[in-house]
């Protein structure tokens, strides 16, 4: 890691403390420009679709096209961000977004944009966002102290919501005065400026002692890590449900704005700005809220407030009623999103952080994409107001139910130890194929059940989290106290990687295992190559 924090930085827990660090401040401004471009693009695309067609499903599909790539490409992008130099990867994603914006501007100039073309290019822009988000999420914990991570993530939320205000304002002004094409051109310019800032970042090149991981195995390991953690799965379930219902208000907002008296692009801008302002104001109070409530309680309360605000928006027949409701929705949105983001960040070690955050992104964007399509179709069958009301009711009931089914959204507060086994030849030049590691334990008969429970739950999860291909526990029939743990790795290099990934929690678990062993010598370890038939 490249933490530049000293003791003073660790003790500075004010909401703006991370901005006092030059690297974070530079990246935060870059993220602000990137988010500003994203919101300008989304607003312009959504409003343009209303001029191309009046069908609610087409308009809602703009939101689906923008978010679906993040669901489809989340894990591959996270694996790449963990396996490649993050600075270069971040730079490439920005240049992609700029290229898409320029191409869309050209098609608009030629008059070749149709609803299908607009959706396709919105999808292409979403590809750039899908590739960009995991790498930025993985970089932030590198440059701020762990104690300041909640504040750093809240500031990223402020960046998102400041752009949620400024983006629609700028886009609305340009659309009303000079036309939509200028929104996409400005989007391209801001993306290029952000790319220039990233290129000037003096980041030490990443070193991969064991070489870069292959894409498919890296994806498998990232998925395994998250799936072997109940707290992380609880976070993923909550973020999926929260965005599945809350995306309804964003997907249908252009039509809601038009339905209000005198509704136009300015009405749409005011509603989006109200939501963004609510999020910014709420971010200032998040440190106090975190001290008063647990993460579990914060997420549940925020979800219920979000559902209530959606119901109010669906019933509002005047802008002065809808805008305050959107303000409350924005406050609830950042409270829930920030709390869940902090929970998963604190539960991920550096080696798998981008992959873990990409799976979080998949859950978030999958919920958004599916929700936009579902609630758009419900609006087509019924009405916009009915669709929003049903979404609000579903969100409140769903989040309340999951809070009792999976109440744990805590995280393991550990860091990498980088513990390397000195007795192992790390070159392994002559080793090819899958590797099987056999570890033999001798356990007192009275403690057999206790040992089995430890190994089959904590032991299994630890091995699979760190990348093992498979795991088994064998119990000797003739010697009841004799167990053999069988760990299969995809290759010799992947076997070595597991030692680089050990955390304090893994080390504590190793001591627990050894406490059960009563043999005169340490547990016997055998390393085998699996001979496969041809």
For the regions a language model picked out, list residue spans one by one.
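Substrate-agnostic recognition of the 12-TM MFS/MFS-like secondary transporter fold
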Residues: 26-42, 66-81, 85-100, 117-176, ...
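Short amphipathic alpha-helical segments
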Residues: 447-470
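Helix-loop boundary and gating motifs at the non-cytosolic
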Residues: 9-68, 228-273
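Glycine-rich beta-strand-turn "strand-cap" elements at beta-sheet edges
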Residues: 382, 401-432, 469-482, 508-534
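C-terminal transmembrane bundle of multi-pass solute transporters/carriers
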Residues: 62, 72-76, 83, 89, ...
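Transmembrane alpha-helix termini and helix-breaking/packing motifs in multi-pass membrane transporters
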Residues: 46-53, 105-110, 166-186, 259-261, ...
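Helix-loop junctions on the cytosolic side of multi-pass membrane transporters
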Residues: 138, 142, 184, 188-214, ...
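Short, well-ordered beta-strand segments in beta-rich or mixed alpha/beta enzyme
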Residues: 378, 434-442, 472-501
